[in-house]
Amino acid sequence: QQRFPQRYVQLVIVADHRMNTKYNGDSDKIRQWVHQIVNTINEIYRPLNIQFTLVGLEIWSNQDLITVTSVSHDTLASFGNWRETDLLRRQRHDNAQLLTAIDFDGDTVGLAYVGGMCQLKHSTGVIQDHSAINLLVALTMAHELGHNLGMNHDGNQCHCGANSCVMAAMLSDQPSKLFSDCSKKDYQTFLTVNNPQCILNKP
C-alpha cells in the first residue's frame, strides 16, 4: 500500500444550458446533484490523498457560452479554449469540468485530456449527465479526472480487487469506486515526472 502525498484540486463545474433545461431551471436541484457528485469523487480519491474542493458552480441558464455539440472532441476543445480565455481570468481554480445533458456520439459519456492537470487548456473534461443514478455520473467524472491526473485506461493486467475499476475503458454495469494498481502507478509517475504545481496549495 503506497502512500501518496496530499494534493488539493480546486474544481469548477459548469452545467450547460441543456442541463438547465433538463432540471427545469431549478438551480438548487442542479447544485444538489453536483454536490453529491463531488462528495463521491472525494470518497473515490481518498486512497490517493487527493482532496477536491468545489470552488465554483456555473450554470448556463440563459445560453451556452461555447458551442456544445454531440462531437465530444469538439466540445472538449471549445471548453478548454473557453477556460483559458474566459473562466481563468475571473475565477481561481485548478481544473474545470463541463457537465452537459447532450448525448455524445457513440458510447462516449465523457472525455478529458490525459495528463492535463494544471495546464491552461487541458485541465478540463466534459461529462455527459448520462444517468439518473448519481453514482454513475460521479464515476464518469472521477474517470475523466483520472485522465487529467495522468491515468490511462486499464488493460487486462490491471487489478483493483473488483470486477471493474474506475479507469476501465467502458463503464461496467457492476462498477466499483476502486483504482487499479495501474492507475496508481500512472498517477505516481505523473506526480514524479510532471510535478503539477497548482494542486500543491491547500484551498
Curated annotation (Swiss-Prot):
S-adenosyl-L-methionine keyword on record: no
Record GO terms (molecular function): metal ion binding; metalloendopeptidase activity; toxin activity
Function: Snake venom zinc metalloprotease that exhibits direct fibrinolytic activity.
Cellular location(s): Secreted
Claim: Nucleotide-binding is one of the keywords in the record: no
Family affiliation: Belongs to the venom metalloproteinase (M12B) family. P-I subfamily.
A GO CC annotation given for this chain: extracellular region
Chain ranges of the Peptidase M12B domain: 7-203
Cofactor: record remark: Binds 1 zinc ion.
Stretches that traverse the bilayer: none
Oligomeric form and interacting partners: Monomer.
Activity regulation, per record: Is inhibited by EDTA, o-phenanthroline and tetraethylenepentamine.
Catalytic residues of the enzyme: E144
Origin: domain of life: Eukaryota
Keywords: Disulfide bond, Fibrinolytic toxin, Hemostasis impairing toxin, Hydrolase, Metal-binding, Metalloprotease, Pharmaceutical, Protease, Pyrrolidone carboxylic acid, Secreted, Toxin, Zinc
Reactions that this protein is recorded to catalyse: Hydrolysis of 14-Ala-|-Leu-15 in insulin B chain and 413-Lys-|-Leu-414 in alpha-chain of fibrinogen
Species this chain originates from: Agkistrodon contortrix contortrix
Modified residues (Pyrrolidone carboxylic acid): Q1
Main location: secreted
Residues noted as binding Zn(2+) in the record, renumbered to the chain: H143, H147, H153
Stated name of the protein: Snake venom metalloproteinase fibrolase
Enzyme's top EC category: hydrolase
EC nos: 3.4.24.72
Requisite cofactors: Zn(2+)
CDD domains the UniProt entry points to: ZnMc_adamalysin_II_like (cd04269)
